[in-house]
Each structure stands twice: as C-alpha cells, then as structure tokens.
C-alpha cells in the first residue's frame, strides 16, 4: 500500500510528528512532498500509484488530472478543516472516501473564542494598553462579568456548538442563530433558537461562527453587525 503525503515540507513538519510518520510507514510505502509548495505537478508525481492521500492547506484540488495518476486511490485524509478546496466532482464520482480534521480543530477554535469572549468582557486589551503606557484604570464599570448576560452565537456547526457547550459552565443566557437547525436541535445544545435580528438586538456578546456559503453572505452587509464592529 502506498500513502502519499501531499502537503509541503514545512507544513508536514508542523502537522505530522516523526512518531506519526513512523506509524504511517508501518502501514506501507510513504511518499512525501519535499518541496516548499504543493504545486500541481509535484502532487501528481507524489500521488502516482497511491492508495491513500493525506492533504492539508495549500494542496490543489484533486481533479481528474491528478486522480488519473492514482487509479487505486480509495481514501483521502484532510489534515485541516473544510475540504472544499480539495474535493472535486471527479473525486466523488470515483467513490473515494474523504475525512477531515474539522471537528478536532473546532475544539481549539471554540476554546479560543471563549477566551477572547472573557478578555473582551473584562476589557483586557484596553487595560493592557493603558498599563503599557503607564496608566491605570479605576473605572470598573467598563468590565462585564460573564454572568447573567445574553450571549448570541451565529452559526452552530462544530465550533459554534462546542462554544455553546463551554458556555454552560457560566450563568449566561445563550441565543443561537442557524438557519439549518431547528429549535429542538439548538435546545439540545443548551441554547434558544432566535432569528438574527432578535439575537443581535438582545445579546450583550455576539460570537460569529458562521461559514461562508450563500445562506450567510447577508451577514456581511447586515447593518447591526456593522454597528458592532
């Protein structure tokens, strides 16, 4: 069995430890990209004859031209979030299974979002700048506790739903907007479903976890969102 690791060498060194590479070698022949970029011609050479491909950021779309180099390819493991950049109609037509790290990566994203929420409520960034410049702020009215307030969550995918889960440790009311989920699904996460206008009007904090399909493009021009920036 041949395993083709397609991401560029610097990224591979970041994502795949020596231990991981050794484990892959136990499964079969491992071909890696030794260059600084995942150019299409390089990818075609590495994937030739492969049964499994490991991709990540920067790898080109696995189109017919690339897939023709690997007629036995059956599995693609994407060491990143969204697979939109690598999948093609040809990939699906051949019945090649694709998995990604989206769920695992979402934990770090949601934890960071919670950390930034706390920092924003405590006005940490402004206080830090004030202290760095030799000042000191005594006005505690600019601090908001993450308690007895309403937090709005826009988008309840992997990151948004885990962010809601983390908020359960705090005494906050959570409103959630996601046009793809019904009231019961959002309630099971620990939030109350709301339309976007209601969420923006009633929330003290808004955390955006919306992806970028057409159904969300109106967010960019929403006047209330712009007012929050």
What residues fall within each predicted segment?
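NAD(P)-binding Rossmann-fold cofactor-contacting core
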Residues: 170-186
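N-terminal Rossmann-fold NAD(P) dinucleotide-binding loop
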Residues: 160-161
């Amino acid at each position: 069995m041949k395993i083709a690791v397609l991401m560029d060498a610097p990224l591979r060194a970041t994502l795949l430890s020596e231990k991981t590479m050794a484990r892959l070698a136990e499964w079969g022949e491992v071909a890696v990209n030794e260059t600084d970029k995942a150019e299409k011609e390089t990818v075609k050479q590495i994937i030739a004859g492969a049964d499994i491909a490991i991709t990540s950021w920067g790898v080109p779309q696995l189109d017919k031209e690339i897939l023709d180099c690997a007629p036995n390819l059956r599995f693609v493991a994407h060491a990143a979030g969204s697979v939109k950049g690598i999948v093609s109609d040809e990939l699906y037509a051949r019945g090649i299974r694709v998995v990604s790290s989206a769920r695992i990566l979402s934990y770090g994203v949601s934890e960071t979002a919670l950390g930034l929420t706390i920092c924003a409520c405590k006005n940490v960034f402004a206080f830090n700048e004030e202290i760095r410049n030799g000042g000191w702020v005594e006005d505690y009215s600019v601090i908001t506790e993450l308690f007895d307030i309403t937090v709005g969550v826009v988008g309840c995918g992997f990151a948004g739903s885990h962010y809601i889960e983390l908020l359960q440790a705090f005494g906050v009311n959570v409103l959630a907007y996601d046009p793809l989920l019904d009231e019961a699904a959002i309630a099971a996460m620990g939030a109350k479903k709301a339309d976007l206008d209601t969420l923006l009007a009633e929330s003290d904090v808004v955390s955006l976890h919306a992806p970028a399909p057409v159904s969300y493009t109106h967010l960019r021009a929403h006047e209330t969102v712009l007012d929050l920036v």
